[in-house]
């Protein structure tokens, strides 16, 4: 993911920081919980979202395929012994850790080849009361990313029926809510939050 390695150092703009603060509040609101103790962030990037959900008593594991992003992630949380990262492609391999009460993934699922299988893999990592929160684009016309191939994009967002089918096939409940509208290319791109639970 060369694009993300190059973009890593300029990734944390004030706009993105504020956006992820709002996303974190939406997750807590929809999940009906204010705090989480063991968090896994899939496609963590620089930890923009995970960092917003981290408390003094919680741990955060960030996984990503981009070395550049993980470098920034590690620098950002270097003083916190409860935060660590792994360079892992979760579609090709696995991690030993489990029993997370919150698994989050923001704007990463459109980079996956088989999102439905990933839901199943992450379901196995949840604690009994754990939730999986996925944030991504609503189905769009393919214009959101300027160069989808170069940027490793496999899906132009996701339709509501698709998300519901992931839940059904993995025996999970799902709540879906539009939490943002991104304005670019003279268009509006809705962003959803899907909360999966047992």
Describe the function of each predicted region:
Residues 107-108:
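Short catalytic micro-motifs in class I SAM-dependent methyltransferases
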Residues 194-198:
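C-terminal lobe and adjacent flexible extensions of AdoMet/dcAdoMet transferase-like proteins
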Residues 117-131:
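A short glycine-rich, Lys/Arg-flanked "PGG" loop and its adjoining helix->strand segment in the class I
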Residues 1-34, 72, 76:
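Conserved class I S-adenosyl-L-methionine
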Residues 14-18, 49, 133-188:
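C-terminal alpha-helical "lid/dimerization" subdomain adjacent to the S-adenosyl-L-methionine
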Residues 104:
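A conserved beta-strand element that flanks and buttresses the S-adenosyl-L-methionine
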Residues 42-92:
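Class I SAM-dependent methyltransferase SAM/SAH-binding core
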